[in-house]
Amino acid sequence: MLTVLGDEDLISLKSGSACIDAPLAIIGPGTGFGAAALVPSQNTWITMPGEGGHAAFAPTTELERELLTLLSQKYQHVSVETLLCGRGLVDIYQALCQ
């Protein structure tokens, strides 16, 4: 469970100070792209699963736009999950090698 992980088990995406009673985002690539929220409630935490992987990939840099162009030749829809899963990480690597 996330609440028993130590600092050495976590990776910070952005520095800052956390609010002890604020919801936490949980994301992770694997066979798909998992996304959930961990929400504090009284003396416990409630897990709220999500479908964040289904969001469309929205490039913001030239490199990301080139990646989208390449992957659009292979996939009809390029979602976050298309990129951030096992197969997608290989696709990103191969695109960067071109």
Model-identified regions with their sequence ranges:
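Phosphate-binding/catalytic loop of phosphoryl-transfer enzymes
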Residues: 1-83, 90, 97
